[in-house]
Regions:
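A conserved structural motif in NAD(P)-dependent oxidoreductases
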Residues: 208, 219-231
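Alpha-helical segment proximal to the catalytic Tyr-Lys
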Residues: 124, 169-170, 244
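Conserved glycine-rich cofactor-binding loop
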Residues: 13, 20-21
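Short, small/polar-rich loop/turn modules that mediate ligand/substrate recognition or access, typified
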Residues: 172, 177, 246-248
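Substrate-binding pocket helix/loop in short-chain dehydrogenase/reductase
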Residues: 92-96, 100-108, 216
């Protein structure tokens, strides 16, 4: 494997969904550093001065994904790399009984359907050019589901991972690599908000809720959560020409959380 070229993404058009904060921002910044033209999507605008092209959209809706597809095809004439990072959970604590039908639907709308809809709209141009990379950001919760706060999220990520594998089987022979990156606990603002919800629901302090989450995951042998920049570096490698034989698989970055090999 050759070393990373500082401008390895020069000339590449990259779309990062959920790219204004957390791991998504770190991923977008990494591609920008590598010389790519980067478009990011989110409901809220990024910090002023970002060099990425911002497309405001709610990807949990079909209208939002249709808008992004029009913008990408119209402004950039297609895309070379898609990183489906958007997703998350806003379900309350309390376990299974608290997850209503609307919350189950919301989990799918936020964690599965954006990827399906965007792939449907943007893959044809990739296939026409005979090349491209699609990275779906899943989660280790697809195999280590937690019942408190993220049950529906975990199920949606399991669906995303299986969808990604099926899609790779179809389009890899056409020159399109499709793979999944599944992080464990990432120390982001969104994770902080989720931990605070757990703390409020259990009437404990933040540090106790953070430790509870780590314990629920079975512990992190590395001793700490992932950093957004570490996830971004893995995604950049997976999308680069250093990984041209990697498709149809899941790459886990979790500090050793998953207890099996």
């Amino acid at each position: 494997m050759s070393a990373s070229d500082p401008q390895e993404f020069s000339g590449k058009r990259v779309l990062v969904t959920g790219g204004t904060e957390g791991a998504g921002k770190a991923i977008a910044d990494r591609f920008l550093k590598g010389g790519a033209t980067v478009a990011i999507t989110a409901r809220s605008a990024p910090a002023e001065g970002t060099p990425a092209h911002y497309i405001q959209a709610d990807l949990s809706t079909s209208e939002g994904t249709a808008h992004v597809i029009r913008e990408i095809l119209g402004r950039f004439k297609g895309v070379d790399i898609i990183v489906h990072n958007v997703g998350g959970s806003s379900a309350p604590t309390g376990g299974f009984i608290t997850v209503t039908d609307p919350l189950w639907q919301q989990a799918m709308d936020e964690n599965l359907y954006p990827a399906v809809r965007l792939d449907r709209g943007l893959l044809p141009s990739m296939i026409e050019h005979g090349s491209g990379v699609i990275v779906h950001i899943s989660s280790i919760q697809r195999t280590l589901p937690l019942y408190d706060s993220t049950m529906a999220y975990a199920a949606a990520k399991a669906a995303l991972t299986n969808y990604s594998k099926a899609l790779s089987n179809e389009v890899s022979p056409k020159g399109i690599r499709v793979l999944t990156v599944s992080p464990g606990f990432i120390e982001t603002d969104a994770a902080t908000r989720m931990i605070q919800r757990m703390a409020d629901g259990d009437k404990i302090d933040y540090s106790a809720a953070r430790q509870k989450l780590m314990d629920m995951l079975g512990g992190i042998p590395l001793g700490r959560p992932n950093r957004p920049e570490e996830v971004a570096e893995l995604v950049a490698f997976a999308a680069s020409d250093r990984a041209t034989a990697i498709t149809g698989t899941e790459i886990v970055i979790d500090g050793g959380t998953v207890p099996i090999v």
